[in-house]
Amino acid sequence: MTMYWYNAVDNLYKQDKQKFLKLVELKAQIIKETMAFNIDDYGSTLILGFNPMLWSICKEDDKFEYYAVCTDEHEADFIRNHEDLKHIKVLTDAEASERKFDIVLALDSYFTRFGTEQSQKDMIAKAHSMTNKALITTIKDFKNMKSVDRLIDPPMVINSDSGSHVFLCHREWDKTDKQKFKETMYQLCCGETQGVVIETKRTLYFKQLAKYIHDLGCKEFRISQTQFYKNLFSRSYEYIAVAKV
């Protein structure tokens, strides 16, 4: 059964909320430590696209403002209607573009969702323009990946009350465009395929990201060499990039 990314996340959340929230909080803590987060310095965050981090970032602070903007209206409606995401204000693209946020989060290699070099560059510029303090993104080191790692991520197993869920991420690379690939994530449980998520993506290299950010006039840009981030359903590490405006 082909599904959206948010369906796979929500299915896991509903099966074992306590474990899910623990996993998400661990990822949130890594992001906070990497950017030297201090709640007194930041008052709002905008998350690009649906992401499990919606359940966690600074949720314990009533004064902190949480926003999300999605290119996919299905994602936006899902967040708006979710009973446990009422603290998130979902904005339209026009609404998000009219204001500034202290933090903009583009996680899970978000910019690889854009299929051309120009569309990636444009989206990075747009994300940068929405923040007045920091843009945080995560990125895989596609340049130095081993051949086998370019094809498949190590399987991820998450145990829940309903059984062991195995997540397997496979990539098929375009034969004419070496940076383009189709990514398929399979969710398996109890001998059955619970769901399949398919997305077409494009690699984004460190040097590309750094150049695009510096061309925008960023005063500070760094990629963490000590703290690493992992997608909720993957054991494959992503680097955390922090751009201070």
Q: Which residues fall in each region the model found?
A:
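Conserved class I S-adenosyl-L-methionine
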Residues: M1-D41
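A generic alpha-to-beta junction signature in SAM-dependent methyltransferases
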Residues: I39, E83, T131-N132
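Local beta-strand N-terminus motif with an aromatic residue
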Residues: Y42, K100-F101
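Class I SAM-dependent methyltransferase SAM/SAH-binding core
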Residues: L46-A96
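A short SAM/SAH-binding and catalytic strip from SAM-dependent methyltransferases
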Residues: D102-Q120
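A short glycine-rich, Lys/Arg-flanked "PGG" loop and its adjoining helix->strand segment in the class I
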Residues: Q118-L135
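SAM-dependent methyltransferase
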Residues: T138-K207
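C-terminal lobe and adjacent flexible extensions of AdoMet/dcAdoMet transferase-like proteins
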Residues: T200-V245
